[in-house]
Every structure is written in C-alpha cells, then in structure tokens.
Amino acid sequence: SGRHAFKEKLVSLGYPDFSEERIDVAFKKFKDLADKKKHVFDEDIAVLIDDDFMKDNNIIKLISLDVSAGTKGQKATLELDVSGKISKTQQSGDGPVDSIFKCIKEIFPHDVNLQLYQVHAVTEGTDAQATVSVRIEEKGKISVGQAADTDTLVASAKAYINALNKLILKRKRTAPTDDEYSAAV
C-alpha cells in the first residue's frame, strides 16, 4: 500500500521506527502535500516529520557559531557538544558554509558525501527565516537534515548537524547485535 511504501521511505531516510499512530499522522500530512505539489522529494518528507524525537537522541549539539566572510577570506569558529564533551575549533574554507562544515568535521570526524545543500526563504524580506536542507550519504545510508533560522549560516550548521545525528541513529539501528556478531565469527 502507499502507507507501507511511506513507512519504508521513513526508514530509508533515517527516522527511527514510529508508532502506527504517528505514521498515520505523518502519512496524512504527506498525502495532503502530494495533493498540492507535483513532485514530493525526500526533503519534503523530512519537513513533515516532527523532529521532537531527535531532541532526546542528539549526540551532537551546536553551542555557538561565529562566521566572518568577505573579500579577504572566510572563517568559522564553531563550538559543539558531542556526547557531553565541549569542543571548539576554527576553520577557513571556500565560503562560509564550507568553513562551517569543515569545523563540524574536525570536531566530529566523519566520512560522508554531501549530496544536497539547499536554502529556501520561508517568508519574504531581509529578515526572512531560511530553511536549509542537507542530504548526506555514508556507505549507502542516506540521511536528511533540516533546520530553520533567520541566520542562513546558523540554519546551515544546524541542518548538517541534524543530518549527522540522524545518521548516527541509523548506524545504531543497523549495527549487528553482540549475538549476531558472535554468530558471524
């Protein structure tokens, strides 16, 4: 059924198993969106999912971010809480977003492919809230992160961190148990 395919899509995007009630709510939102849009992308589905469950499961948390950009170069100073350990670093990159992502990678080493980086203004004007979508891939596992903020660079950092946190959850769910590992050895 369409609902079953939707449930499978949620799993492939890195969301933990939902209760049947929660899937029903999300599927209804998905159908409403599909009626309005010609194409529904993975990022659209991620927006529909309530990220409340992530708040208790975040390994990586953004504490602070300072960015300078201009004709003389870009650099980001980033502070993260990774499993209760506070770390701070500074990186330069090819633009402010690259600098931010390099900081995150230095503090939390990982090897992912950035498949998508997308920014959308939620409203009009210079004070508009930006929604950033990030899709990363690691060994065939795809994770989509999203965040919104009036500061596009803060939203970018939060979206990337959100994608990493979902990937960490996905790793935990697909890791072999001790029994499975022992049986394989």
Give names to the regions the model predicted.
Residues 1-185:
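Terminal or standalone catalytic/regulatory effector modules within metabolic enzymes
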